[in-house]
UniProtKB/Swiss-Prot annotation:
It holds the Pfam family Trm112p. This is UPF0434 protein HS_0657. Belongs to the UPF0434 family. One of its GO terms (cellular component) is cytosol. It comes from Histophilus somni (strain 129Pt).
Amino acid sequence: MNGRLLEIVACPICQGRLKYDSENEQLICHFDHIAYPIKQGIPILLSDQAISLSTSLTNPEQQNQ
């Protein structure tokens, strides 16, 4: 994930900063406790595609859908 992109991209729900999780290929909003998947190098910043952090930790297979 490009560091410059991380400087300008924001959570679509709270407009907060996102943190890159390279292990799971997702952008995390710690304020809302959600993650946005990155598919083929493209962050999917749609609120209906966001994954609850508790869900992603307990069911990692959901991230690949």
